[in-house]
Amino acid sequence: MFSRDLTIAKYDADLFAAMEQEALRQEEHIELIASENYTSPAVMEAQGSALTNKYAEGYPGKRYYGGCEYVDIIEQLAIDRAKELFGADYANVQPHAGSQANSAVYLALLQGGDTILGMSLAHGGHLTHGASVSSSGKLYNAVQYGIDANGMIDYDEVERLAVEHKPKMIVAGFSAYSQILDFPRFRAIADKVGAYLFVDMAHVAGLVAAGVYPNPVPFADVVTTTTHKTLRGPRGGLILARANAEIEKKLNSAVFPGSQGGPLEHVIAAKAVCFKEALQPEFKTYQQQVVKNAKAMAGVFIERGFDVVSGGTENHLFLLSLIKQDISGKDADAALGRAFITVNKNSVPNDPRSPFVTSGLRFGTPAVTTRGFKEAECKELAGWICDILADLNNEAVIDAVREKVKAICAKLPVYGA
């Protein structure tokens, strides 16, 4: 029998110390990684619940194990809320991650060797959209589209490639593209060549849920997303679709038993919590502020003479090219880290450096907006970053910025009393 008093602090001091250090880092550092956010205590409560003990292979009402009557209720809540949130007819809440959701879509609708047309990783796409190092690039014939000289997707080029290569599936989505995707145009191109349209909205799902970014569900054959990032839930995946019995059956089978065994019901419960949070009016206000903050930061970089890819942002993220400054993303990332500002190095279009070094940085505002930053704080923050980028070896500037960061983080904590 377990004692409820047996906490990690009492049982495993080494592990607890590292966990406490990470919690302190999250409070004292400014988080600007576009794919990161802070979940609510309710989301974390669900993830740490007794649901982690329950195995539940199958789907609600069709399980292979007994004792699933309550996890059936929980999973159905998550399904119903996801469908309501995104206006979908179908939702599968079982994928453990966004990449696994994407793999399940490919497994459901493609055969090995089929051609897919997705956005190049070097131009802002994702590994799972056909990158050569990913299974999506190894199992399928991946053709890539990119952005033009102005940093925008060239839809005429997408159409030309689609007509030339006749893909079985067109993938629309990104990990580092700051503009609005034209879902009607993607749909028209897919229809022209008889392809499935698959949209990966992992980065903008929260914006979509709040109505501040176009919803791809009415246009796509299938949509996937993560449940963290802008959606501000647990780390996990989600598949959505319009009513289509054949596709729904294929998707369910591709998730279980095709690519996963038992679902993580404690994470599914946390997804249900985050979907409920996203259905509240204040969530729209939050997402509107996320975009305002990203625009404010990008504007400062442009004013200070830096190159923002695509010339600005219409969502929660943007890419900063440091090619003109001859600064590597790796070195810039490290210098900002010493100032308690967390970013990620990122390749930029026509990057002369390797993906392990890069010539760019990716910024995102979901996390800082969660902790209460508005345009004024974001403009000030962007100015501090510019000061550091002006001389990565000026430790006096880095030290001064670090003290400012600690002060503003203390003023705007992630988790209040």
From Swiss-Prot:
EC main group: transferase
HAMAP family xrefs: SHMT
Compartment annotation: Cytoplasm
Main location: cytoplasm
A GO BP annotation: glycine biosynthetic process from serine
Gene Ontology MF, one: pyridoxal phosphate binding
InterPro entries, alphabetized: PyrdxlP-dep_Trfase (IPR015424), PyrdxlP-dep_Trfase_major (IPR015421), PyrdxlP-dep_Trfase_small (IPR015422), Ser_HO-MeTrfase (IPR001085), Ser_HO-MeTrfase-like (IPR049943), Ser_HO-MeTrfase_PLP_BS (IPR019798), SHMT-like_dom (IPR039429)
SUPFAM superfamilies found in the cross-reference section: PLP-dependent transferases
Reactions that this protein is recorded to catalyse: (6R)-5,10-methylene-5,6,7,8-tetrahydrofolate + glycine + H2O = (6S)-5,6,7,8-tetrahydrofolate + L-serine
Protein's job: Catalyzes the reversible interconversion of serine and glycine with tetrahydrofolate (THF) serving as the one-carbon carrier. This reaction serves as the major source of one-carbon groups required for the biosynthesis of purines, thymidylate, methionine, and other important biomolecules. Also exhibits THF-independent aldolase activity toward beta-hydroxyamino acids, producing glycine and aldehydes, via a retro-aldol mechanism.
Subunit relationships: Homodimer.
Protein name as it appears in the record: Serine hydroxymethyltransferase 1
Organism classification: Bacteria, Pseudomonadati, Pseudomonadota, Gammaproteobacteria, Pseudomonadales
Keywords from the UniProt entry: Amino-acid biosynthesis, Cytoplasm, One-carbon metabolism, Pyridoxal phosphate, Transferase
Any Pfam family the entry gives: SHMT
Pathway given in the UniProt record: One-carbon metabolism; tetrahydrofolate interconversion; Amino-acid biosynthesis; glycine biosynthesis; glycine from L-serine: step 1/1
Modification N6-(pyridoxal phosphate)lysine, positions: K229
Binding residues for (6S)-5,6,7,8-tetrahydrofolate: L121, G125, H126, L127, S354, P355, F356
